[in-house]
From Swiss-Prot:
This is Urease accessory protein UreD. The gene is ureD. Belongs to the UreD family. Required for maturation of urease via the functional incorporation of the urease nickel metallocenter. Keywords: Chaperone, Cytoplasm, Nickel insertion. It comes from Acinetobacter baumannii (strain SDF).
Amino acid sequence: MNRIQQTFQTSSAPFWYAQLELGFCYENSRTIMSHRKHYGPVRVQKMLWPEKTGVCHAIIVHPPAGIAGGDHLTFQIETERQAHAVITTPGAGKWYRTNGKQAFQHIYLNVKDDSILEWMPQETMLFDGALAHSETDIHLEQTASFIGWDMLVLGRQARAENFVQGGYHNQFKLWRKNKLLVADTLYFEGGDRWLSSCLGMNNQAVMASFWAVPPEKFRSSFYLEQHIELIRELIMRMDVPVTLTLLEDVLCARFLGNDVRRCHDAFAAIRAKLRRYWFDLDEEFPRIWKT
């Protein structure tokens, strides 16, 4: 029996232990969900096929709308050969103020050869007083492609709330086969000087990262340099605080500012361009973003 299932079934503590497993495969000219399993309050809200190429758009929802102290939330998602899945959420995620215990989120993404995964959750809000630990592990096979992002908002901006208590620990790793391509680790506590330092957050409330791995045929320096220059031109036209770098053949974008909508618009625009360059696909934003 799955460890998460055991904990969920036997624990009497007032915490949520939730896990969602999804598998996607290509069948009859479109991507379908071949595997779905969940424990606790997390599930697929809806699947859509808005693109002529049969790309599957899946909306995942966590009904408590956030993660509180003691909660454990796990996502395990896999795409099989030729599958193309776009995964998003219906609204902002939340790390709630702690009850004294740490909250955990684990994301495991496995992208098989010749498949594409787009992982595009909406922003996550870190409430003042939250104790949050998040880990993301992405494993790509040799010819797999990936586009994904993570957006973090410190405090509730509508209440002019700052992050003065609590702590946040985030680990991100992106692998191709057994080779580590990207490793990011971030840790800070409420009120840290790093939050106001020009070497850190510089008193900004929104920080975000975007990663993209092209199909194998576009991984040469010729194509990568050409595409990153086109993205730089896009960012300049949009006049947003985004920086771009290449880590081997991984395109990385970073946002640091105070407006999460500008971040979302910038990342969505980058994603739209890369879809056109790499996959010859239209932008086709998830419909839930328009509601």
